């Protein structure tokens, strides 16, 4: 059955209806977007260029930085455009594409965090077998697998949403196209779409979350009951602190949005929580990893010296 929609475009009503705030919000979110792309881009380049960071942990960190750059680029450029535009329209195809990439990158990031937690579990609980278990082939296979699962999960949502009939209002009370606000505009039966959102997306969100918690549970019990050393426990948890903070930043708003969507939360609440995981989390991830990770800070300092040192040589030679 072909899509019989009569709607050719949607109107994204944005973050706020107060026109006086639009220029201010444009500057704020443009700054956030620049910091997010620059910070995650710097981590990605450092992980690629520094041989000391060619390990499974930083391989996955590079994947996370790449995801965060793409993730924020799915929603923020259109949001910035709409801050300065009177006609805040997005085409039907553009809306479905935005929905697809949003769920593709979001679900991939959720699974990636679970893989990163497993990597920490192997490193702490099975240190002698770490290089054997987390070999480059396995790391590459896991990365490709979660990217593919995320893609096909998003494809399912985008195909099912594109087949709905939109025959009424085209005003989306959100700053980007997502499944939940689109289902509110659809005519006809959306029970299957609601089921996909609750069950499939809920499983992809909650499954990795519980696997992450399970990894940390095994790490804590292993160190506490087998080593009986609080100092080792504190040291191990310190190395995992950055990852755990990122997990909390991502899952707190995601759980609020997708697990409680059936309770009828307002669109204003949805927009606020969406800002947390689409805007705030990607910009905080590089800050968390650079501030709490000595290896990343060291690699960043070495990279800065490599980039700045030739300039000092040229400056001294020209003065001579």
UniProtKB/Swiss-Prot annotation:
InterPro entries reported in the protein's UniProt record: GPCR_Rhodpsn (IPR000276), GPCR_Rhodpsn_7TM (IPR017452), Olfact_rcpt (IPR000725), Olfactory_GPCR (IPR050516)
Alphabetized UniProt keyword annotations: Cell membrane, Disulfide bond, G-protein coupled receptor, Glycoprotein, Membrane, Olfaction, Receptor, Sensory transduction, Transducer, Transmembrane, Transmembrane helix
Primary location recorded for the protein, binned into one broad class: membrane
Entry's localization field: Cell membrane
Topology feature Extracellular, residues: 1-23, 77-97, 163-203, 260-270
Protein family per UniProt: Belongs to the G-protein coupled receptor 1 family.
PANTHER family listed in its UniProt record: OLFACTORY RECEPTOR
This protein's name: Olfactory receptor 12D1
Organism: Homo sapiens
């Amino acid at each position: 059955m072909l899509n019989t929609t009569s709607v050719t475009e949607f109107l994204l009503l944005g973050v706020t209806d107060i026109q006086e705030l639009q220029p201010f919000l444009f500057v704020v979110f443009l700054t956030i977007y620049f910091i997010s792309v620059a910070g995650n881009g710097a981590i990605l380049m450092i992980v690629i260029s520094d041989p000391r960071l060619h390990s499974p942990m930083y391989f996955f960190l590079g994947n996370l930085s790449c995801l965060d750059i793409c993730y924020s680029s799915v929603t923020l450029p259109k949001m910035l455009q709409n801050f300065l535009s009177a006609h805040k329209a997005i085409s039907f195809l553009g809306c479905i594409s935005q929905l697809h990439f949003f769920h593709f990158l979001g679900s991939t990031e959720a699974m990636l965090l679970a893989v990163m937690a497993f990597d920490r579990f192997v490193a702490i609980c099975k240190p002698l077998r770490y290089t054997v278990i987390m070999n480059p082939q396995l790391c590459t296979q896991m990365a490709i697998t979660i990217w593919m699962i995320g893609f096909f999960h998003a494809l399912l949502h985008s195909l099912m949403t594109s087949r709905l009939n939109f025959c009424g209002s085209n005003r989306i009370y959100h700053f980007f196209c997502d499944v939940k606000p689109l289902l509110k505009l659809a005519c006809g039966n959306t029970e299957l779409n609601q089921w996909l959102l609750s069950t499939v997306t809920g499983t992809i969100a909650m499954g990795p979350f519980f696997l992450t918690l399970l990894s940390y549970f095994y790490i804590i019990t292993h160190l506490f009951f087998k080593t009986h050393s609080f100092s080792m426990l504190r040291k191990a948890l310190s190395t995992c602190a950055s990852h755990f903070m990122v997990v909390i930043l991502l899952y707190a708003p995601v759980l609020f949005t997708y697990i409680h969507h059936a309770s009828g939360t307002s669109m204003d609440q949805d927009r606020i929580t969406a800002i947390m995981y689409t805007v705030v989390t990607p910009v905080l991830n590089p800050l968390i990893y650079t501030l709490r990770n000595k290896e990343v800070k060291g690699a960043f300092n070495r990279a800065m010296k490599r980039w700045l040192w030739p300039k000092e040589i040229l400056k001294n030679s020209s003065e001579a």
